[in-house]
Amino acid sequence: MPFHNPFIKDGQIKFPDGSSIVAHVERWAKVRGDKLAYRFLDFSTERDGVPRDLTWAQFSARNRAVAARLQQVTQPGDRVAILCPQNLDYLVAFFGALYAGRIAVPLFDPSEPGHVGRLHAVLDNCHPSAILTTTEAAEGVRKFFRTRPANQRPRVIAVDAVPDDVASTWVNPDEPDETTIAYLQYTSGSTRIPTGVQITHLNLATNVVQVIEALEGEEGDRGLSWLPFFHDMGLITALLAPMIGHYFTFMTPAAFVRRPERWIRELARKEGDTGGTISVAPNFAFDHAAARGVPKPGSPPLDLSNVKAVLNGSEPISAATVRRFNEAFGPFGFPPKAIKPSYGLAEATLFVSTTPSAEEPKIITVDRDQLNSGRIVEVDADSPKAVAQASAGKVGIAEWAVIVDAESATELPDGQVGEIWISGQNMGTGYWGKPEESVATFQNILKSRTNPSHAEGATDDATWVRTGDYGAFYDGDLYITGRVKDLVIIDGRNHYPQDLEYSAQEASKAIRTGYVAAFSVPANQLPDEVFENAHSGIKRDPDDTSEQLVIVAERAPGAHKLDIGPITDDIRAAIAVRHGVTVRDVLLTAAGAIPRTSSGKIGRRACRAAYLDGSLRAGKVANDFPDATD
């Protein structure tokens, strides 16, 4: 039956006193206590996975027990860091902190490869009073903290070791007001020191309602994810369940990467299903699943006709990716309209916009030169200057997005590219411990609006979040054109990195699809190898600070034995023809060398840093999502 959303009135989202995600879990524990709430598919011991389940009543009891223990050893307002492996205990730890009236900090087990530096940086910022982990991971966590000063070693609690009967001492904390922080969502950026977005209980509840409304959620819809819970997209997807009241299934990122068919099979219709399946995936996952997740002949039947939505909230999805995924899974009933290009960011809790539920992904082709000059001008797909742009759909209810000339803080008309500013009660309240950055990002005032305006409905004194993303409205839809900080400027001309990267990967089959990074570096910082290469067309000049284009690309499987000369020549030629710019260095690397964020995005700034310090050329592997098999 259709999900009746009692919190939406006259285009606004309003909650009764005492309403929170915690209150919703307690409600389901009373009225659906024996029904499944969360299922973890554990592939660590069985190839086909072992389901590990919690009912709503069990989930409530575990949450109250952990909360009671936290109330014994911490104070209101204390931060509680979650350093659990991705399993049921992680969700109990997160909710336990909320139940206790403490500030949750969703992080990760220190044994996660490549994340130790980030973990230290986050802990230095939030200074937690307690750590929640598991019995199995506790020794590794304590060992990690032994590397820190004695006064920075918080109490470590294994959530699975807290007895259920401790729940009897739980004290329901004071009702949160609109400023009460629920958790800190640390951004997934690759190079800068992580910043913790302060997400209030009101922000969280609002954004969950916005997602459900945008997807036309129904009772009986179930959620599915393999994304890490320390990432906003993974966390919010898991939190849809307490609002709808149906169950959520998850696995680890490694389980998906190693065998993407696991995710595909969980998307499929299950016995007893009364609704659809809602999932999320970054852009690379669609190609990965299409390449390696299609059932082999003789496999059990697969019915994907029930898939309601798979949100893609990372970099814009390409027409080729959509085509490959639909060709791979259309024969199994996958609905083309289920792929939902979306837009979101931690500063908005997560969700800003998505493709309407009844629509297929909308991908238009625009003139490259016009786009680089700040305008959306549609052209035929076969135009030599055509570049594809995927719509991010419509902005959610009770939130607003405007395209702004950042220098003058004025709204730009449709069709013009500017910085995306957003507003609504799902916006976080700032960055933890960073007041100046908080004001600069979260406390902006829109000085003038167009007529009509995309800010219609927002108050005149509303504050706006600067997203750092370029975008435009066109034909009623929001389009994301790129990150402000990632824009490549060569000889005074703008180039979007994803456009350059697409041209590079299309130039040669020896390049791994989706594993290309484009960025610029000053000429006098290029490595010696560039000046020794006649193809670079540049001579060393210590005073030359002009920005020069660099392409880093991972080799496709089986391409490591090929002569790199023709490959790099093809890339240089393709970019020269399509973009009118010279590539000074094409660096081909082994698989896994290009850094990625926790959501699977190319970490361009981290890649640039590794290029400049020489670690990329030295063969360092930095990928968070290794292309492993088991």
UniProtKB/Swiss-Prot annotation:
Q: Which Pfam families match?
A: AMP-binding
**GO process annotations (BP):** fatty acid biosynthetic process
EC no.?
Answer: 6.2.1.20
Q: Which GO terms describe its cellular component?
A: plasma membrane
What is the activity regulation entry? The acyl-AMP ligase activity is inhibited by the alkylphosphate ester of AMP, adenosine 50-dodecylphosphate (AMPC12). Also inhibited by eicosyl-AMP (AMPC20).
**GO terms of molecular function:** adenylyltransferase activity; ATP binding; long-chain fatty acid [acyl-carrier-protein] ligase activity
Q: What is known of its domains?
A: Consists of two globular domains connected by a flexible linker. ATP binds in a cleft at the interface between the N- and C-terminal domains and its binding induces significant local conformational changes.
What keywords appear on the UniProt entry?
Answer: ATP-binding, Fatty acid metabolism, Ligase, Lipid metabolism, Nucleotide-binding
What NCBIfam families does the entry give? FAAL_FadD32 (NF038339)
Which top-level group of life is the source organism from?
Answer: Bacteria
Return the CDD domains for the record: FAAL
Query: What pathway does this protein act in?
Result: Lipid metabolism; mycolic acid biosynthesis
The function of this protein is: Involved in the biosynthesis of mycolic acids. Catalyzes the activation of long-chain fatty acids as acyl-adenylates (acyl-AMP), which are then transferred to the phosphopantetheine arm of the polyketide synthase Pks13 for further chain extension. Can use decanoate (C10), dodecanoate (C12) and tetradecanoate (C14).
**What positions does the entry give for ATP binding?**
187-192, 342, 346, 469, 483
Give the pH-dependence text from the record: Optimum pH is 7.5.
Q: Does the keyword Lipid metabolism apply?
A: yes
Annotated protein name in UniProt: Long-chain-fatty-acid--AMP ligase FadD32
**Keyword Nucleotide-binding applies:** yes
- Catalyzed reaction equations: a long-chain fatty acid + holo-[ACP] + ATP = a long-chain fatty acyl-[ACP] + AMP + diphosphate; decanoate + ATP + H(+) = decanoyl-AMP + diphosphate; dodecanoate + ATP + H(+) = dodecanoyl-AMP + diphosphate; tetradecanoate + ATP + H(+) = tetradecanoyl-AMP + diphosphate
> Which protein family is named in the record?
Belongs to the ATP-dependent AMP-binding enzyme family.
User: How is this protein organized at the quaternary level?
Assistant: Monomer.
